[in-house]
């Protein structure tokens, strides 16, 4: 992986999140996990380059993100679609998903990411907020919450950008 600056990124994040999906990768004192995400955002907040990811409050990954200062967001080529599908449908509660997926753990400044990613954002968590159901303004959004499982938004400062060789 090669490090580049945020301004050198040439990637369509709309497709990256929504069409191609991505992984949020996190490690706490006990274990690590990778979870497929299809909702996210990139932008500037508080004069920092940030990425926002959304995790349902019932997901095993949530407590790990709550307890971690850093995480990574990894984007992959289409050939990894089956692995992302697996990582999005299985729970770390039951198995070591990264090992079972045969993806390779690597580190950048003690932050875990996956070697096979074509683009990795190393994130320092700077804010998190639960999204309350009673604040939904567009009622069409409620179809995503029929079982009441809301999301937590995790906003991270992009501290490093890595691209595949």
Stretches with model-predicted labels:
Residues 1-37, 41-165:
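Active-site-proximal mixed secondary-structure blocks
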């Amino acid at each position: 992986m090669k490090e580049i600056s945020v301004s050198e990124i040439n990637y369509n994040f709309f497709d990256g999140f929504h069409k191609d999906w991505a992984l949020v990768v996190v490690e706490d004192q006990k274990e690590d996990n990778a979870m497929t995400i299809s909702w996210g955002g990139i932008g500037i907040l508080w004069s920092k380059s940030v990425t926002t990811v959304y995790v349902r409050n019932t997901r095993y990954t949530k407590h790990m993100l709550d307890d971690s200062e850093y995480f990574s967001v990894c984007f992959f080529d289409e050939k990894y679609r089956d692995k992302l599908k697996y990582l999005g449908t299985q729970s770390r509660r039951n198995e070591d998903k990264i090992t079972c997926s045969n993806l390779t753990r690597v580190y950048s400044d003690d932050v875990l990411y996956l070697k096979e990613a074509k683009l990795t954002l190393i994130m320092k968590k700077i804010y998190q907020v639960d999204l309350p159901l009673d604040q939904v303004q567009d009622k069409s959004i409620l179809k995503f919450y029929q079982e009441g499982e809301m999301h937590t938004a995790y906003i991270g400062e992009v501290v490093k950008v890595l691209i595949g060789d």
